[in-house]
Amino acid sequence: MNLNASSVARVMLGDATLCEDDLYLGLGECVLRIRSNSPALIRELTGYFSHVAIDAKEAAMEVIAIEGDVPQTGVEFTDWKREPGKTGRKDAYAELADGRLVHKVRTGMIFLQSEEYRIAAGPCLQYNNQVINFINSQHMNWLQHRGWLICHASGLVHAGQCLGIAGFSGGGKSTLMLHMLDDDAVSYMTNDRLFVRVESGQTMACGIPKLPRINPGTIVYNPRLQGMISAEKREQLLKLAPQELWELEEKYDVHIDQVYGAGRIVAQAPISNFLILNWKRDSDDETSIEQVDLGARRDLLAALMKSPGPFYQYPDGSFQQDDASFDEDAYLRELQDVTIYEARGKIDFDKLIGLCQKTIFV
């Protein structure tokens, strides 16, 4: 079956009527328009993206989200290969003549990615986080088309300079970042997708409007976040073994402006330092940070390199493949003027924050 994006779009849109309400997002020079058949979904997305919502009439791209049953496309999907260390089925895809269809295995959601159509269809209200990720994927594509390199990292801004934070799986970069935000002099840039690019001899960092999405283990020990759950829920969680609590997968969105105050989000800034968390929960060594040469420690690149994923469409219309290898030299080139630090020893957030204040935030 040789389907094209237009024929699949007709199936996904069905007889849905798009509501009058829409949402425009101002992401630097990139403007996105979001439309849906569900006013409730537009309201939810407007609340989530409130810090980048703008009044506009024109957009570089349009994303349509159709709330309803999962459309029956009749397409046969192929599983997208997971990254090392990840298990279970997550994404599947089907190539079209001029686009790609992506199926979220756990939720059933369907997404059409092409140069003309960007459509999400299925129970969008129930799985609005996947719609949010799809919207952010369009911004990520736009950035990468303009030479920005994707990093699996958080980003904070202090004194006008970005600090990137990367870590191996379960390293606690989101927890560390949120603790650092307790300092009013620190601003939020991004949770786990940071983009870097050298401009006129200066290395710049850019984030995407994705709020931190955290597990209960991050909430229970952070007084600033404890209001996100009930006192009863916190008591139940504190009864769990530390390792069980750490591994518990329940997701909560942290609305930065509500928790930390207005004006605490920065979209773009020069980046001068990058911290890679290579510490261990079961280590007996004291927490420490050391400046390292990334070229001589290519093993650390695995913590910060990130595949663009199944939604990435190159400027020539072709798509990212799941067996594409990373270009390590591209990361070394873009980060050559950024000071790289490695955190070692046992996981101790308070100790590491103190070390960062003495070593990096000076």
Q: What are the functions of these language-model segments?
A:
Residues 1-166, 183-189, 194-362:
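A noncatalytic interaction/capping subdomain that flanks phosphate/NTP-handling catalytic cores
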